[in-house]
């Protein structure tokens, strides 16, 4: 049997994964996949190790992990495959597939256009009520936003590694 796992980034906001969960449900309904699970790399769970274990316990011998990311950043290039390789050691009988991320697809152009059109009735950002930041505490040592200075960014853009 085959399982599909949609693997997202994760968030401190409990509702953040609901859209991905809806996508998983629709994949099952529309295409008949017997098992489509959702998990996250970090923050609130469920996390990949426990989700993979669930699939294995249900007898899946092939698990396809689809990274639910738009861009091939560090998580796609290193973090996720590294995490998957570590977990794969526990289940030598299971074929663990690292699938394609969302990346570019012509259907995304239509989706972005839909969002642009739907934004016509949106409020000016200054009118949006914000929840208190204290509601979403930041773990020690982590920042809300980590910008890269232009010189450092130029090095990464030039050779792709920053080394």
What do the predicted segments below correspond to?
Residues 1-163:
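Extended amphipathic ligand-handling, pore-lining, and cofactor/metal-binding catalytic surfaces
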């Amino acid at each position: 049997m085959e399982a599909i796992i949609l693997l997202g980034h994760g968030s401190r906001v409990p509702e953040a994964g609901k859209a991905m969960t809806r996508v998983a449900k629709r994949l099952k309904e529309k295409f008949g996949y017997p098992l489509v699970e959702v998990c996250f790399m970090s923050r609130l769970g469920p996390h990949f190790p426990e989700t993979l274990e669930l699939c294995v316990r249900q007898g899946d011998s092939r698990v396809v992990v689809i990274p639910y990311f738009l861009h091939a950043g560090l998580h796609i290039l290193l973090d996720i495959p590294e995490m998957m390789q570590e977990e794969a050691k526990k289940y030598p009988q299971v074929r663990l597939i690292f699938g394609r991320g969302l990346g570019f697809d012509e259907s995304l152009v239509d989706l972005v256009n839909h969002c642009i059109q739907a934004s016509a009735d949106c409020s000016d950002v200054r009118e949006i009520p914000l929840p208190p930041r204290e509601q979403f505490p930041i773990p020690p040592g982590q920042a809300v936003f980590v910008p890269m200075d232009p010189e450092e960014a130029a090095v990464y853009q030039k050779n792709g590694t920053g080394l």
